[in-house]
Structures are given as structure tokens and as C-alpha cells.
């Protein structure tokens, strides 16, 4: 055994004791200390309890030493890296004084081991040996005096004193105060680290060794690098990983007894619980788990699970998935192969078209083929096409020198001609200058035989050929078939049988496809639709408002895809509808400058009217329209025109109830009124200024008289029933009085008055069908009866009264509606035209045939 193991002990061999049971020895030492303490207290000695503390350094295990840990890590690193120094006998891995932290400076003297604490037993032994058991302070003072005298007698010289001072000073500089009880220590003292700093450095050092920290400030970093790489490796076994954590976390240290609890552990929530409290905590935790055993943990957390779990212990069965994947890949490959085949076919088709174009260019001698690319993209114009043809194929086209030369014939051209024996003529194919030519010795076919006779040779040759053909029937049959083919009539070239240039282009582009489903290529097809402008021009469509266009033709009807016959029918109906100018003016008000009914018109200034002037029009059955808006005045004008159209009905009834003279007078008045209405019917382009001029003219006075006469005639049947008849001159007088009133009214005022007058029995509201029936475009293009006034239906409202001006007897009451529409029976109005105007054809024909039902 190495003797160095016992070098640090100052005790003799007899003081060494062996302890077999640490707990028993610890208990015995405590009891012994208490016994000795009580003994010395009885003697009157002042001994503190700290002197009787147990010798923790000898009796208990040594404390954790950081220097020892570093030496241990260095040794372990050398072992793991298999450093050659581990095989050297003289290598020391652990220093003798491992507890000292400052054994790094070589200039400092070797530190002494920390002094052993003096116990009471040692102190008694020392007193007995040195002072014979006497505890007196006088002896100490005497000893000090003797020591001073001895030193004074042995005082050194000045040089020795200086040398001694320097040595002591150097000793003091390098000396460290190991004893905390000394009153004075060295001049300089190294600052010791606090407990927190030491713990932080140890934690960083442990993290660095475990591979959790990149850098660390350590002088032995290079020596400990192999251990760090070994412990931070991913291939570390479970046992080695446990050993690493056990060493770095100091699991071997008994920290439960020596640890000082914090403030929170003592008084706070982190305070250790007693056994009863721990038992209660366990019971509460078990009860909570039992009550909520059916609930999932983390109920407040939304769990998300992946569709495909990659890291799963279950054996995955993805055979069907692999088959689907293989099938998809195979389909994609087939699709790509078919697309390549289509590309090849498309390329061949393109080459075919290019070849045809090249031939056309060669034949025509024009690189552009007579047409430019821009002209091929434009719409076909026959006139432009004729002009282009005239420019291309003019006289200059045929006069151009194409630079053609006579082709050189091959050397055997004569032989090729002679092969056609069916049309062979010796006189046409003779060499030289005709029958008299006998040949020359330089000719290729010159016969050197002296017995050769050219005239007889030809005959012999023909005879020989005939005999040969007789012996070979097969050649004769072939020759006959060949002759039949030659003599057969060849078909003439028909351009319609050949494809056009556009058809070739269409075939080329039809080879493209968006996708291939199965074996069938799918292409996007365009649907050809019938163009329909809905009876409107481009200017009307662009300038009209969206609301007006939707009123003319709804957007739903314009965008939907309908059959061709329906589109053609709509096209025909809207062309007929477009001829109705009044309907266009009514719908497209923004185009004709009339504005919309929904637009707000600026309020016009109302003239100040006296009460007398205000009551005058009311008495006359007229209403002023100067304060009304423009749209309302137009509606009143239209109602006045409708009332004028219904006037013949009233006149017909009056003529039946009156005598012939009165009927003649009333007829004349009605004719004047009708002519006035026809001439002065308010047009939709009229303005207020024109109305003012008409009122101030002499014709307006005459018009007012006729209006009053018409009103009197309308009221006359009521008076006749009551037994009296109002004189006509009185009506004219009242009309003249009313016309001279200062308050002016518009032309639509009588119609307004008639509407408000409830006593008028002939003022009946017109139905919607009658208003649509009276639209002028239905009879717009009819000829005949052009002269004279016409009503809204285009018929003469006074034709009935003109045919029968006087009746000796009261005429039988007839149906006004039927009589009014008699001229329309032969008008030839189709049902489609009636539907275009929103009229039910069945009801319309019934009204024409039977008349309107009287209530």
C-alpha cells in the first residue's frame, strides 16, 4: 500500500480507532460531549458549546469538493478518450490537497493542511504536559518576558535584520489566512466566491458536459472536451445516460440534511407538508381522478389529430393506396403518350398544309397567295373580295415573265415515246428529215448489214410484233384494260369536293384538346348563337340607361341560351316592336330629351292668382296646370288625347236621341272638335313656350269655343232626359265668356275637368287593353283613308256619322266597341304582333267579333 495515503495525519498509531457502526459512534460522541461539558461546568470553567462540536471532518463523510470533482472529470475524460497517460505509473490524477482551490501558482509555498480543531481532551492533555495541570495566566506572562529577553540578547545585525524583514515581507505577501479566528491575516487576500456564484458555475459546467451549453469559461476545457463529446452523443446508451445524470446532478450527495430551506419553503406554498397533510392531498387527488375518470384530460384544450399519423406502432396496410397510386401513374403515362401521339399527328397535319400552301405559292407565283394574314382574319366582304381579285388577276398578272425555260428531256425520251405501240406511227417518229432519210453511219441505230432494207424492215418489224401479240393473250388483255382506262372519261375537277383553306385550319386546331377522359379527347366547344339586337341600334344601346334597356328587354332574356327557333322568333318580334316610335319615346326618355318620370323636376314658380280667378276655371270645368310638374302635364295631355278619341261614342248616342237638325249641328261641332284635337294633339317633343304662343293666338280662342260646345253636347243627353234642352247659343255665349277670362289653362285642362266631374255619365275610365289597342304603330303602315283626322287607332272616328248624317227615326243602339273596330277585321294583325305589345290575341279577337260587354 502506498504510504502517501497516511501522510496527512498527525496522530499517532495509538490514537487511531476503528468504528464499525457510524450511528452508534455518533450517538456515543454526543453523549460523551454532554457528560464532559457538564463536568467542566461543575468545575467553574468557562467553556463554550462550540468547542464540543463533533469532529465532522473525521467522523463524518467529507464534504463535496469542487476541486475533487474537476480531477474526477479529467480522469474520466482520459479514460473515455483512452489517453496514453493513463498507462503511465507516475501520473497522478488526484492531488494530495484536493480541498485547496488555490494550488495553481508554483511560486507560492506548499500550503499546510488545515489545522485540526482542538478538543477539550486535547487541551487538558496539553495543560498537563506543559504546565503540570495548572491553569494560571501568570505563567504565560512570565514566559513572554523570558522570550523577549532571549530575543533581545540574540539581536541580529543590520544586514541580517534587513534580510529577515524582506523574507518576512515576501512570506506575508504569499501567505493566505486559512484560520478565520486569527485577528490579523495577510495584507492581500483573494476574494472568495459566493455560494450563488459557485453554484452557477457548477451548473454551467454540468450543462456544458451534458451538451446543453455551447461555451464555458474554463481553463481545462480542452482536457474535458472528449468527455463532453461522449456524453452529448445521441448514441449514448440508457445506462450511460443515467450515470451521466447521476454524476452531474450529484445524486450521491446527501443534501436533505444539510440543505437550508428558503423562506417560501418555510412559510409559503412551497412549505413542506406534514404526513397528515400529504395523506389528505393523496386522498383528494384520488377522489378527483375517480370522479372525472370518464372525462378526457385537458378538456379545455382543443385537440387536433393529424389525418395520417407518421410515427405509429400499428402496422400500416396501404396496399389499396399503392394500387390506386400505381393506377393513377399508369393513367398519367397513357395520357402523356396519347398527347404525344396527338402532337405528332398535329405536326404531320401542319406539314401537309404547309406543303399544299407551298404548291399553291409555286403555281400562283405569289408568296402571299393573293391574301395577307390580316385579310384572312377579317370578316368576309364580297365587294372587297371582288376588288382584291381584280387587283391580283389583272392583265399584268398574266404578262409577268415567270422565267420558265424549256425543260431538258432525258436521253431516252425517244425510247419512251416508242413504247406506246398502240398509237405508233412510223412516219411521225422517223429519224431525221422524213421517209427519204436512209440513215448515217454515225447514227446510234445505224444497221451495218448490207442486206438491210429500211422499207421492208419496218413492215417485217410490224408483222413480227403482231405475231408476238397473238401468241400472248395475257398482254393483249392487259393492253385492252389499259386502253379502257385511257379512253375512259375522266371526272372534271369540282372545287366543292375539295376542302377549303379554313377547313384545313379547323382540322388542324381541332386536334388540340384540353383533356383526355378514357380514350376520348375532350375539347371546349363554342355554341353558335343567333345575333339579336332587340330592335335597337348601337347608339341607342350605348346611350340609353340600364333601367330603360331592362324595361325594353330584360337582361335575363338577353343572356340566356335558348334554341335557335326561339331566338329567331324574338328577333322578328323585336323588329316589329322597334317600328313603334311612340313606344320608344315612352321607354327611352333619356334619348329623346324628355327625362324620366322618376327624376325630380325643379319646382316652377306659381303665379299669384286671386280668389276670383282661381274659382273661375273650376266653374268652367277646367283645371290649371301651370303649377304642375312637366311629367304630370304630359300625362294630362295623353289623357286629353284619349278623351278626344272616345268622343265619337258620345256623339253617336247623342245623334240617336236628337232630331236630324240637331244631329247635324252636333256632328259639325264634333267634327270641328275632332279636327282641333287632331291638329293640336300634344306631341312629345313640344315645349311650354310653344303652348304659350298657341294660347295667345286667335286659333286658341276658337279652340276654347269648340271645347265649350263639346261639353254642352256631352251634357245635353242628361238635360233631354230631364225634359228640357239647353239652347246652343247660350253654350256659345258661356264659352265666349270663359275664353275671355284672364286665367289661362293648357290643352289638357278639359280632360282633367272631365275626370274630376262626377256628373258626366260618358266619362268612363279606359281599360288597359283598350289603351294598348289604341297604340298607333299597329296601323302605322296601312294605306288608304289618309286624308282627314284619325284617332289613336288610325281610323276615322267620324266615318260613321258622315255616312248617316240624318236619321228619320232614332237609330238602334249598337255596340260602340264593335263598330269602332270594324275596320280592323281585315287589317291582318298577327298574334305575334299582338303579343309583342302585351295584348292577349284571343281576347282581342273576341272583342272585335262580339264587342265589349256592357255592364
UniProtKB/Swiss-Prot annotation:
Any Pfam family hit: Kri1
GO CC annotation: 90S preribosome; nucleolus
Disulfide-linked positions: none
Stretches with biased composition (Acidic residues): 48-64, 441-452
Biased composition (Low complexity): 609-619, 812-826
Ranges in coiled-coil conformation: 307-362
Residues modified to Phosphoserine: 95, 97-98, 137-138, 179
Region (Disordered): 47-67, 82-117, 130-196, 312-342, 424-453, 589-855
Ranges of biased composition (kind: Polar residues): 720-748, 756-773, 792-805
Record has Membrane as a keyword: no
GO biological process: endonucleolytic cleavage in ITS1 to separate SSU-rRNA from 5.8S rRNA and LSU-rRNA from tricistronic rRNA transcript (SSU-rRNA, 5.8S rRNA, LSU-rRNA)
Chain intervals with Basic and acidic residues compositional bias: 82-91, 160-176, 650-664, 674-692
Sorted UniProt keywords: Coiled coil, Phosphoprotein
Basic residues biased stretches: 630-640, 842-855
Superkingdom of origin organism: Eukaryota
Family: Belongs to the KRI1 family.
Protein name as annotated: Protein KRI1 homolog
Source organism per UniProt: Drosophila melanogaster
